[in-house]
C-alpha cells in the first residue's frame, strides 16, 4: 500500500502548526476521518500556500487504539473506574437506547407478524390455502414430546441465569441505571 497525500483537508491549529491529513485511498470514510481529526483537535481549514506537518492517520490509529481511551490499560470493574453518577449515566443512556430500539423493533415485528397472520387468515378463508389439520396436530405433538425430553437437559440456562444475577449484583448501580433507562426508552 503506497501512501497518497490527497490533500483532502489541510488545517491550522491553535499553536499555528499546519497539519495535512494523509489519506490512503480517497474513499468517503477517509474524508470523514480527516474531518473528525480536524474537528477533534480544534483545527480550522486553511489555505494551501503555507507549510505544514504531515499526520499519517494509519500510523496514529496503530499506536492509539480506541479501546485504550475507553477502557484504559487496566480494564477492571466499573465500580473502581467511574463515580456513581457516571455509572448511572452510562447505564441510563445505554438502557434508554436499548429500550427505544426494543420498542421500535418490537412494533415493527408485531406489525409484520400480525399482518402476515391476517393475510394467511384471509387467504385461508378465501380458499387459496388448504390447511391439513391432522398434520399440524401430529407436528405439535411431536414438538411437545421433544420439549419434554429436552426440559431435563438444560443446565446451560441455569448457568446463564446465575452469571446474569452475579453481574447484576456486582454492578448494581449500572444495572439499575440500565433498567431505568430501558423503561424510559420503552415509554418514549
From Swiss-Prot:
Its main location: mitochondrion. The keyword Plastid does not apply. Keywords: Autophagy, Membrane, Mitochondrion, Mitochondrion outer membrane, Transmembrane, Transmembrane helix. GO terms for biological process: autophagy of mitochondrion; response to hypoxia. The chain crosses the membrane at residues 21-41, 82-102, 109-129, 167-187. It is found in: Mitochondrion outer membrane. It holds the Pfam family FUN14. A motif (YXXL) lies at residues 52-55. The keyword Lipid biosynthesis does not apply. It is a multi-pass membrane protein. InterPro entries: FUN14. GO terms for cellular component: mitochondrial outer membrane. Belongs to the FUN14 family. Acts as an activator of hypoxia-induced mitophagy, an important mechanism for mitochondrial quality control. PANTHER family: FUN14 DOMAIN CONTAINING (PTHR21346), FUN14 DOMAIN-CONTAINING PROTEIN 1 (PTHR21346:SF2). This is FUN14 domain-containing protein 1B.
